[in-house]
Amino acid sequence: MAYLAIVCLCLDLATEAYFISLNWVNPPVTAYMLEGSGEHLHDYVSLRYVSRYMIAATIAHEDAQLPTRFTGIDWDQWWRRATAYLNHRGDPYGSPIPEQLAKNLLLWPSKNPLRKALDAILAEQLVHAISKQRVLELYLNDAQFGPDIYGVCDATWYYFDEPPDYMSWNDAYELMGVLPSPIHAHRLPGGGIDMNPATPDGLIELGLIRGAEIYVPQDLGIDGGLELVREMGITGTAHDQPNGPDSCRTMPQDIRQLIAANQRPIAASGQARAHRHAIS
């Protein structure tokens, strides 16, 4: 028993040390990435270079309490979520951003109740080791936005041919739609996200993105829109920031190579771009 207690204490201290290190270190890979197959296209961007539209949409849709909540999660909501799960009902709230990030960094995909409880414990450790801004920055850099595509830097260049500081509201809504099922998201040959209902993946993304285009603006209207960004202590606009090493203002080479490898003939590319505008 004493041996087990020592092991648990060592694991707890190691986890705390890892979370504290995230104040200075950008993790090159996460447990969630290792669960996937293939490459991990993952280029980092500092939060100050991310469009305020994307930041506001992410907070409003994923965790509107993030700017003001002291704890990693809302424990009342967590208990209701646990009760719903034990009664075989759907999740009434969804996981807040610190819980999602802690899971992505260290844990494995599972619906096991014990694993879910571990999510919550790690979320509490995380928010007391790093700032809320840093939590959001890491979340946006580690979230999956497509097969092998991780982080908003790679996502904006891959889908929209633009840096993350030039995203529009509509770009943000579309990426919010990709988050629930990123393995089905693909780039159109001329740019944009494939939402062609004639293909299985396109049909899935069409439904998810159209839903996000309805619900994310509603969430923003309820929760304060860009005021959420200011509540996080983020001021100014992203594209007015001076260039820096983590600005992601140049297309990453691995994304350029991926686009080139998947490029279709010019005629098909033109048709795809026209289709994107037709359904936007």
Stretch-by-stretch model annotation:
Residues 1-280:
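Juxtamembrane regions of bacterial inner-membrane/periplasmic proteins
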